[in-house]
Design a protein with these regions (language model features):
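A short SAM/SAH-binding and catalytic strip from SAM-dependent methyltransferases
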Residues: 115-128
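N-terminal, positively charged/glycine-rich alpha-helical extensions of SAM-dependent methyltransferases
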Residues: 1-21
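A short acidic, Gly/Pro-enriched loop at the edge of an enzyme's catalytic core
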Residues: 108-115
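A short, conserved alpha-helix within the catalytic core of class I
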Residues: 125-137
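Conserved alpha-helix/loop element of class I SAM-dependent methyltransferases that forms part
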Residues: 31-48
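Class I SAM-dependent methyltransferase SAM/SAH-binding core
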Residues: 53, 59-105
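Conserved beta-strand signature within the Rossmann-like core of class I S-adenosyl-L-methionine
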Residues: 144-153
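Class I S-adenosyl-L-methionine
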Residues: 160-206
Length: 206
């Protein structure tokens, strides 16, 4: 777990010093690509009146995006890097951001949120992404009452490099079936990405 944090810090913290715009700090291809990932969430999930947790919130850009849409919801963001959270508060002082490793020790209660959103957390190749993803699923679903939404890189539409990690859609769907009976896969918004939108089972695996 500490190796993952070190890898993430080594990759993203230099970008904090180099760039001022959130999508560049988070190593997205462009602002448009970042926004299109957010649009998948807002176009497919009714967020009005909901409590949402943004896992891997970075500099809080989803908070700013949702504010611009005037969606009435309770937003919370958490990131493993404290420097990201410091920057998030600089940009969005009215946001609710937390620094911590939710996969190791969560500061939140079970089923505290209606919707869990996680964008880009699994993109960087950490050497054990499959294990990390399997560990993350029960964390996602234990904190959500209604829906879990996350995106992953698609190996079929991208020149693969060792820097990033790509997931097989069929394998992801197989893993998630124990947590959800209603799963939607969204593709086509950008070539190298897919988003999973999963309803939360009332009875979760122990």
């Amino acid at each position: 777990m500490e190796d993952r944090k070190r890898i993430v810090a080594n990759h993203y913290e230099p970008l904090l010093n180099k760039y001022s715009r959130g999508y560049e700090i988070l190593d997205w291809e462009s602002l448009d690509c970042q926004v299109k990932r957010f649009e998948v969430l807002t176009k497919n999930v009714n967020l009005s009146g909901k409590k949402l947790l943004d896992i891997g919130c970075g500099t809080g850009d989803l908070f700013g995006y949702l504010n611009n849409l005037s969606i009435n919801l309770n937003y919370y963001g958490i990131d493993i890097l404290s420097k990201m959270i410091e920057r998030a508060y600089e940009i969005y002082p009215k946001g609710r951001f937390f620094s911590g490793n939710i996969f190791k020790e969560s500061p939140f209660s079970k089923k505290q949120f209606d919707v869990i959103f996680c964008s880009g957390v699994f993109n960087l190749n950490m050497g054990d992404n499959e294990i990390f993803f399997k560990e993350a699923l029960p964390v996602f679903f234990s904190h959500a009452k209604e829906k879990v939404v996350f995106n992953l890189l698609d190996p079929g539409h991208f020149v693969q490099t060792d820097k990033y990690y790509f997931f097989n859609q069929k394998e992801v769907l197989h893993l998630i079936r124990q947590y959800s009976d209603d799963v939607i896969t969204v593709t086509g918004y950008i070539p190298n990405d897919f988003t999973i939108i999963a309803d939360v089972k009332k009875q979760q695996p122990s």
